[in-house]
Each structure stands twice: as C-alpha cells, then as structure tokens.
From Swiss-Prot:
Predominant subcellular localization, coarse grouping: nucleus
Feature: compositional bias, Polar residues: 508-518, 551-560, 1299-1311
Region of interest (Disordered), residue spans: 1-37, 386-406, 457-518, 532-601, 700-727, 775-795, 955-979, 1284-1311, 1324-1350
Stated name of the protein: Nuclear receptor coactivator 2
A Pfam short name: SRC-1
Amino acid sequence: MGENLSDPSRAEPRKRKESLDQLGPSPKRSTEKRNREQENKYIEELAELIFANFNDIDNLNFKPDKCAILKETVKQIRQIKEHEKTAAANEDEVQKADVSSTGQSVIDKDALGPMMLEALDGFFFVVNREGNVVFVSENVTQYLRYNQEELMNTSVYSILHVGDHSEFIKNLLPKSLVNGVPRRNSHTFNCRMLVKPMMECEEERHDGQETHQKYESMQCFAVSQPKSIKEEGEDFQSCLICVARRVPVKERPVPPPSESFTTRQDFQGKITSLDTTSMRALMRPGWEDMVRRCIQRFHSQHDGEISYSRRHHQEVLRQGHATSPFYRFSLSDGTTVVAQTKSRLMRSQTNNEPPLVLSLHVLQREQNVCGLNQDLAGQAMGKTLNPVQSSSPAHQAMYGGNPGQDTTISSNMNYAISGPKEQMGLATGRFVGSGGMNHISSLQATTPQGNNYALKMNSPSHGSPGMGQGQPNSMLSPRHRVSPGVAGSPRIAPSPFSPAGSLHSPVSVCSSTGNSHSYTNSSLNALQALSEGQGPLAPPLSSPDLKGGNLQHSPGNMNPPQLRKMGSIDSKESFGLYEEQPESATGQGESGCHSNEQKDCGENLSSVVDKTEGQSRLLDGKGQQKLLKLLTTKSDQMEPSTLPSNTLGDMNKDSLSNFASNSMSASAHGTSLKEKHKILHRLLQDSSSPVDLAKLTAEATGKELSQESNSTGPGSEVTIKQEPVSPKKKEHALLRYLLDKDDTTDNVADITPKLERADNKVDPSSCPKLSAVKAEKEEPNFGHTDQPGSDFDNLDEILDDLQNSQLSQLFSDTRHDGNSADKQAIMNDLMQLAGENSTGLPAWAQKQRMLRMQQNNGFNSQLAAQLGRLPNQNLPLDIHFQSQASAGSFAQMRSSGPYTTVPQSGVINNQAMMGSQGNVRNSSPGIVGVNGPRPPLKPGDWGSQASAVRPACPTTSTAMNRHDMSRSPTASIPMRPGSQVCPRQVLQSAVMNMGSSELDMNISGPQYTQQQAPPNQTAPWPNRILTIEQPSFNNQNRQPFGSPADDLICQPIVSESPADDGNLLDQLYMALRNFDGLEEIDRALGIPEMVSQGQAVEQESFGSPESNLMMEQKPPVYNHAYANQGQMAQNSYQPMQDPGFNPMGQRPSYGILRMQNRPGLRPTGMVQNQPNQLRLQLQHRLQAQNRQQLMNPINNVSNMNLAMRPGVPGQLREQGPINAQMLAQRQREILSQHLRQKQLQQQQQQQQQQQQQQQQQQQQQQQQQQQQQQQQQHRAMMMRSQGLAMPPNMVGSGGIPASINSPRIPQGSTQQFPFPPNYGTGIPSPPPFTSPFSPVPPSPGSQSLSHSSLHGSQMNLANQGIMGSMGGQYGPVMNPQMQHNAFQFANSGMSQQSDPGFTGATTPQSPIMSPRMGHIQSSMMQQSQANPAYQSELNGWAQGNPAGNSMFSQQSPPHFGQQSGTSMYNSNNMNISVSMAANGNGMNNMNQMTGQINMTSVTSVPTSGLSSMGPEQKYC
C-alpha cells in the first residue's frame, strides 16, 4: 500500500514532465487515474466500515485523510485480534468446545445489532423509495414512543416534521434526481421526528384540549443503495438505510432568546396597556412590527365563529388563567415567528380597582436550522406548519408529504414561554389597542408553522397535514407555501391557528430551495424591512437564525378559500382596518387600532406596558387610569359608538390616551399636557353635554376633525360643544388628538375654531391620523361662519371658569418665549374657540358680557374682559391677550387710547364693518363681530373687518376694534406665536385696555409674519395692521381713542364673570415671570433707562428703531392704540421692515413703541417720544417729501393726517372698502413708483430733515422724556402694584410685560379711507395713478367714531401744529377733534391707528393698530428697506431720534437702515409719530389719534397697504 500510495505522488511529476513531450493521453496515465479513483473508493468504504462514531463520519464530509483511515483500520484490526486472544485465554476449554460452533466471532450476530444501536444511542430503520418504513428496530420506542409494529409499513412522513420532508426526500431520492449533484453513498442529516403523544394527551383531546405535538431532533446517518443489497435484488435498490440518534444537547443549536411583551386587558378583552420593555431592551430588529403582528394575529384568527383571542379571554375569566396554542406569523422580512399567549386574571387586593387580565406573549423567531427549537417553530400550528428550520437545502426541496400524514406532529420540546406559566397566562382578550398596531402582513405570516398548536390529530397516520378548507382568518402571505400533506387534512379544523395555510409544502419548498434562509443576515433583514416600508425601529437582529424565511408558501398551494380570505385580510391589513374584520364586537375594537395609533403604541408600548407586569404594575398604572378617567369620564358613561372609529373601543381610546399621555411626558409635552388634561376634563364635565358631545362627534365622525382636534386647549372643548355627533366617539377622538397632539405643531390657524366648519374637523375614526391633522394648519382664510348662540349658551360660564381657573395657567405656559409658539398655539386655540363661542352668542348675550365686563371697571375687570376676549379667538391667537381686552371681540381698533374711555357709537359702524368679516355680531357691538370666527377675509376685508369690529362695543369700541385687528383674515393664523396672554390681561388698565389689546397686537408684532395671509397680502396686514392704523383716527369709524378700558371691558364678552382682580394680577404676574420676570418687564419698559438716562430716553425713543422691530415682533407694551403708531412714527422705517406691519413708527412718547416687534423681542424700555421733536421731524419729513400721497391710498386711513401741523386739524378720510389684495397691489405700485421717483429726493430731504428733526427732536425729546419718564415711572409703579395695570403711556412704551405679547388683534376700522398713498406718511404723493386711493372723506360713522374717541379736542397746539403741518396737506382728512385727541396723549398720540381704508374694515382706529401697523410697517418697512435712499433717510432720522425714549432706543437706527425700503413710510410715519408724540400727555387721546393718524396714515398705509406695500417695497 505504501508504494501504491507513493506511486501516484511520483507519477504526478512525471506527468508534468511528460506533458511537454506528449500531447495526447497515454495508456499509462489512464491506468494511473483509474487506480487512484479505485483506491479512493476503497478507502471511503473502509472508512465507513471502520468509523462507527457519527462525529467521525461527519468529519468525512470533506475529503478523507487516507493515512488516518488506514491507520485507524490497522488499529482496530489489532484491537480485535488482541481481544480475541484475551477472550480465548480466559475461557475454559469446555466452554470453548461449547462455543466452538460459533466460530471465532466475538459477539453473537443477534446481539450485535442491538449492541451497536445501544452504543450508537439510536435506532435503525430502512425506508424505500416510496417513503414507507420497511424496517425499524425495536428500540425506536425509546425515542419516539412508537412500537415497532406501529411504524412498520407506514409512511415515514407521518413521523417526520413537515419542515423536514424536503430534506429527507433529498436523501432518499437517487443522487441523479436531487439537483443532479453526486453524493456519497453515506451521509448525515438532521430531521425532526414526531414523538407519540402520551395517553394524557389523548384524554385531553376528548376534553377539547388540543394536544401539543412534540418532536425529537434526530441525527440520521444514512446509506443509500448499498452494493451488497443492490446485488441481491431489486427490492432494496433505492432503499435508504438509516441509523437515527438524538442530537446531543451540545450539538443542538442554541435557540435565540425568546422575546416577550405583556398586555393588560379589561374584562371586555380590550387592551388597556402594553409593555414592550423587554423587547425594547433586546433591541432586535423589527420588534415593534413583531408586537403589532402578534397582536393582530392573535385577534384575527378564528376558530369557527369565535376568535382565538376571545376564546382565550373567556377561558381566562372562567378559569383564572389560560394558555393559547402556538400560533405563527411572519414579519415583514419573512421571518417566521412562533408565539404563545398565557394569561392570568389579576385581582388587586390593595384597592378597589376592577380585576384585569394580564397576558404574556412569548415570541420565538424561527431559525433556519433544522435542530433549532423545532417544537417552537413547529408547535405553532401543529404539523401544518412548514418550519423551514433546517439549514440544509433539503428543507427547501420539500417533497409533498402524504396527505394522510399527521399534521399535528409536535416537536419533543414544548414551546417554553419565558417566565412562569402564570405570567404566560395573559389574557389574550382582544388586544384592542395593540390589535390595530400596524396591521401589516403579520396576518399573512400568521399561518401557523409551529406544530405546537395542537391540531387534534391523534397519530401521525391520522391525516393529511393539509387543511381541508382555508382558515377564515389565517392570512397567508403569498410567499407561504402549504405543505401538500397539510393541504387537506380533514382532521384539522379551519381554525385560524391551523397550520394548513402556513404549512410549507415540500414541493413548493423544493422550488424555493435556495430561499429558506432568506434574510438570515441581520443587515439584509433590516434592508428588506426598509424596502418594504417597515424599517426596523430596533437594530436588525444579530441572529439570522430566527429569520429563517422558510415561510415561502406559494398561494398556489393554498386552498382557494384561503387565498380569498388572504386577499381580503391583506387588503384590510394594508389599511390597518382590522376592526372591519369579522371579529367579535370587542374584537373589532381591539383590532380597530389605527396604524398611527399603532405607531404610537409601538412607541409607547414600552412605557405603558412597563406597568402591565405583575400586580405591582397595577399600582403603577393607577395614575394613568385616573387620568383616563379624568379625561374620559363622559366617554365611559356613554355607550360606545358603533362607528368604525369606535371599533377601537373605549378601552382602546383610553389606552391610547394613556399612551398619549405617556408619550407626551416622554416628549416633554408633560407640562402643557397636564394643563390640557385639566382643561379637557373641566370642559368635558362642565361645558359639554351629551348633546354637545354628540354634535362634536357628528362633526368629527361625519367628515373631518373639527378644529377641536386642531385646538389643544379648552377652546377645543368648546368646539366639542358646537360639534354634534356621537359624544363618546367625538370625545375620545378629541381627547386622543389633544393628548397626542404635538403642541409645537399647533398653529393659530389650527386653533382658529370654526367649530361649525366640517372641513376643519378631523374624523375621529381618523384619530390615528390625528398626528397629521395636528400638523395641518387651517387655511389663513376662513369662510365666514355664523354659529348660533344656542350652541354657546353655557359658553360664558365655561369660559369664565376657564379664564379664572385655567387660562392664567395656560397663558403663563404659553407665554414662555422659547415655547411661546407651542403654548401660544394652545392659547390661540383656546382664545379662538372662546372667541368663536362668543361670536356664536346672540348679540344680546355678548352685550351682557360686555356689560358685565364693563361693570368691572377696574383693571382687573378689564383684564377679565380681555380674558373674555377668548371669544375673539377667531383672531389669530397671537392676539390672545388682545382678546383679553374685550376689544378683541370688537373690531380691533387701536384707537382706544390708554386713557380714552369714551365709548363711541361710531364703533358700531366699525362693527358693521366687522360684520363684513363674517360672523360679526353687529347686534352685539364689537364683541360679536370680534368674537365671530374669522372667516378667510377677502383682500379688502382684512382692514375693513377690523374696523367694523372695533366699534362693536359702544363703550370700548376701540378695544373691540383691536380685536378685529386680531381677527384679520389671518385670524385663523396665530398672530404672534410668542404673544403671551396673561400679561395682556394685566394691561387692562384704561391705557392697558387700549394698550393691552393694542399691545398684544403690537407685542405680537410679527403676527402677520406668522399669520398666513394671502400671498398678495402682507401677513402683517391681517391682524396687526388693522389694529395699528385706525385707533387714532376718529374719522375711520373706529374710536380713535375710545376708552381702551371700555373697549377691553366690552371685549371680555367671553368671560361673563369678571376675573377677580387678584386672579388676573396673579395670572399677569405669572405670565411676567414666564417672560423673564418683572425685571425683564422693567427693562422692556425702559424704566431703568428712564431713571438713569432721563431725557436721553426720550431721544432714544426716536433714535432707536429697535422698538419698531420690537413692535413688529410683538410690542407687548402697546396698550395704546397709538403707541404702536408712535413707534412707527419714530421707527416708521422699521415698521416698514416687518411684513407684519408692526408699529408704523413708535413715537418716543409711546412706551409701547418699545414693544417687541418680533415674538422673541421684548421692549427694552418704555420711553415716550417727545411729540415736539417728532412733530418737527414729521413736519420736515412731510414737507420735504411733499407729503407723498402714496401711503394714503394704500392706507385708506381716515387717520392719515400724518403731516399734522399744530394749527391745522387733520380730517380723517375714509376710503371705500378696498380689497386687501387691491390695496396691496396698488400700494406696491405706488410704493415702487414713488420709491423710484422719490428715492433720491427723499433721501436728500430726509437727511436734511433728519438733521433738523434730530435737533428739534432732541429738544422735544428732552421735554418729553421728562414728562414721559415721570409718566412711565408712574406707570411702572402702577404696573407693579396693579399687575401691569400701567397707564397708557407705560403700556405704549413697550414696558408692558411680554404677556401683552399676544398678538394684537388688528383693528381695522370699518371705514376704508381713500387717502393718497403718501397721505400722512410724509412721502411725496405718487403720480396721479395713485389717485384710486385718493383720500376720501371719512364716512360719517368713521368720523363719529373718531370724534367720539378724539372728542376731547384735547390736542395740544403742538399736536395741532403737527396736524396742521400735515393737515395742510391732510387737514381735510383729519378731524379737528381727532387731531386734538390724537395729540392729547404723548404716548397714545403716536399710537398707531390702523388705517381702516388701508387695512380694510379690520383696521379699526384703535391704538392697537400699531402692532399690526408695526407688523405691516415693519414688513413694509423691511420691504421698503429695498430702497437704500429711504433706508439712509430712515437711518438718519432714526439716528436723529436716538435721544428718544429708551424704548425707541431699542428701535435703533440700524433698524431704520434695515428698513431702508420703507424709509419713505417710516420717515413720514416717524415724523408724524414724533410730532404727535411731542404733545405729551395732554395729547393722550388726540395724540394717540393724531399720532395714530400720523402713524395710521403711515401705518394705515402699511396696515392695509403696507402689508402689501412691504412686498412691493421689496420689489422696488
């Protein structure tokens, strides 16, 4: 042998050498080759004979080591010989004689076989080509419990696991038939063999208990076609001789750790909580999808008429515990998961809580390895399952098993659920919440592949593995292929768990032999999940074992009914509409979980489910349950709706609410959510009756979620009242939406409550989609919707309660600067809802509210009234506090001066204007109009609405007009995200009243920026512009200085009961604290600067354009309607900057001018501009610029008497209502033309004028600063002592707490004044083309308003001089009374009155206009910044004003520089504002009016036109 072995090795070199010489094959080489082949063959056979150890045989899978084989052979031969010698020596001779007949054999032939089998620890069997067991050794009983007789002549497939059929077939068939791959005669493979059930199992079957099939993993060493047998005859030519032994434990693949999650169900089987902590900790890929699919599968499978989940739940309730059979489902990546649910009935001994069912769901991902927990894989549905666990391709080559084969073969291993069985006994009662979770193809995967699911098949012979009919609920993925054996087993019921649908037919597997291991790689798994749109939330599983893609069931193998069912279910799954499946009513609720909710559940399951384990978790869940009870008390009382949305079931909703609450806390929504919960609970209990809830539900379910879903605050609750529908459903939808809603996504637009509007409503059934609805914003323009007051009969009380108890908290929350956008969204919702509610009230009801508010004449009452403005929430919620002053309910006229308290019937005219806005309650002056939900305003409606609303309140028409400002078409949009409600309430002193709503408007200066105005309409337009322009001009039909306090008082229509002074002050202080504290407010007011700088502050007011910017953002301090205008006047350029037309130009005298133009800005100080310097500046500017009339047509401001000469009374002119778009267009054209023509001229003139004005202003400012400092100090003291009940000047100075930030409601006077575009702006009038806006005499109503508000004719001569200067040009426009009043108050004198004409009806003449004007101006000014000439002029002018009030100092010249484009407006406005401010306190009302007029002319232009002008300036 040695030479023979060595010869080939030596022959190789010879061959290589000869190959060069010999090209053709030689006989010698052929002989050598044959010898080598034969030698290798003999060595192989020798190895098979010598090596009895299977492990050694396995080692032969690779090329055997010849030397090792020969060595072992020699060794064994020697051992045998030595053994024989020893035995012979020990035996007696007699014995030798006795045994001589046996020859020399050491072991008897009969005993050799059993001994060998015992040594091998296995049994021996022979299978012919047909798969029948020809022979089996007797010791098979030790392994499979079957007797030899039972298995003889039976099909081997009856005891083989379905998943191993294909593997066995590959070994049985001749190698020519198996993939054409040659194979050794002997080979080893693994398979699972059925263990005969115990007798106990038989008895259980009779009891209806399905036995769990048990499989034993066996390792088979097979020899096919042995030559010795083949030679003897043909019978056994193709037989397979096998020795089977148990797979050693050490050799068995370690199954991946099982995954589990717990659910908690109520007595109806509805899932109340879900805990996925353990799964989340494992972070295996697709665990969320696994949870969803598990719950879906468990609830979707039916056994006859009852679902398995329901049957399981009933068993738990009956016995206290239950264990479900194994069921299977597939993940999106094709991984088969075997699941089992164990539930126990838990009773709490520590409290009276009702018992609940705790369920533990144990999940095992099937591996593609044959030996892996085969019982787990196979147990799921009995033998019907086709677990493709064996890694060998043979599994995939599955051949059809005999139909008679028992499909219930169970693996020897019971599917062990991690944790005690008690825990396993989780109630599988419908998992409502989770049932809806991502109804993906999990149902498809549900086809049970595990055999553990006992299919009442007694013996393997019993029946075909196939199911006779498709399982009604089993959703077989098209990839799943049913084993032929399983296909028609008559024994197996079509139970949802029946593996039949899921069985993998060996044949089908053969076709997909290469696919059994699909996605074994974790990365592949993740990729597929991603490709299928179900990206794994967790990192992909590291163990590919569980992902065996054995579930390759082809639909072709399924029964037609199964396919049909699959199709229907799959379609449902795709939509996540399990609720529609024919589950029990409760089942539907469980499965009704929406996909979105499922996502939420997936995210929140861990948090919620954490509490589900053990009774201790019950205690943990108490808080959540209480919260649910709190929020859903009414819903619990109501019967569940039958609508699909109700399929979720109350528990579903509750669980969702819990999830939402949990997730919110996790997402840092906790604080706002708590407030929401409180509000919701209170609203639901106090304000919503079943009828109201039904209405809400009707809206929600009928078509779209109403704004209730959009609104996060009590307003949403109000919405609930208004909306009719099934109360329970709606309520749940609303609660869930509110709880789940992301505050950050809320916008005033979302909040603007058009309760009656179905389009704004979200269908509760779409609650899972609420997240999308949340994000969605309502259109800035809302159609006018009138809501009957009957719906809001209880609204007043509710709102009062909310205001007194909760609004302050909400406001304080919303007033945080950083979070103001989010919180203000809530506040906006609340206020808008309240506003709509109030609008829904009859006029008489609103009047009553106004009266109530008026009765509370104190600042607190005003504050309450402002709170009452909640009804005004139709306005952008930026104007939250604007609504505080009932003025918000009225057209938002900023005309109401801080001190002007004279109610004016003229307001009604504005109110009528507001009526045009839609839902304007003309009957209830101001309030109604304001309260009415803002419809999408037409371009011309914005300004007009504000003006119309403003006069609504006879006593506080101005304030009301302000509200309209807020209500500008963008009312639906939050005017200013940063605006804070509470501080505004504090500002409700007379000045505060004007200023509070005004300030709110101003503070939220960027309202318009935030507002979603039509593209052609500058955002600032809608709310603030109106407010800014009109207030100061009586001619505009809005009370220029109608008592702000009165207006505010009227505005609080929403809150019937006046808020207690203490409460209001507390709220205000809370808001102030939120705003960085009183010190911040002081700094904003400029009090420290005033004290330290003295007159320098006055100069700052002029010099600092920042105040304008502040105004643009949200001048919080514009208590005075004119304060904003003053700001604009000073920083008139800056207001131009802010597209929102914040302050037209702050006058140094207006503390408000320091108001923050942008939501994030705060007024640096409240310094009143000196009217004298301002007047001079304005006069110079106006004269130099030839009083350009471009602004007048734009503004349509009756107040446009910007160039007011001291001796000349300005007459307000009203323009006919002009569309905002038209105004914007015209303004843009005018501005562009004017800018082009006058840029250079104006720049030069402005520079000269600015120098002169600066000198004059410095002198005037010094005087004014002294007065203003005194006033401001006094106001600061008042504000601190009275909770920001600051004098108008203080308010105007921007010292008002940011709480006033809440966007002012643009007060557009009803009147639209056709002033020249430059009217009151000091900008040279544009060419005649601007004549369309040529000033039109104010309508009598506007005049009456302006007169009444201005009616004190208290204007100083200086103011009159200013008015005169302007009046020369604009004199006819401006009413003498108005002039006087306008200049009466230094601060308010400058307060901007939104130009009704420009702003439209929404630009009442309330000083609050300034915010809008500020916005508009700021936007306009910003836009106008495009004009460098104006910019320089603005800069020069602003620089001239630096000595002005500190508030204005904040409005630093750089702002003017920024507002270069707006310079012509700003310069004019600022001049006007300055001149108006020059009058000082004596000018309070007139100053405000004139200031506003000046500002309004400027501001009005920006207000109605500037918003649009702003863009044009940009274009210029």
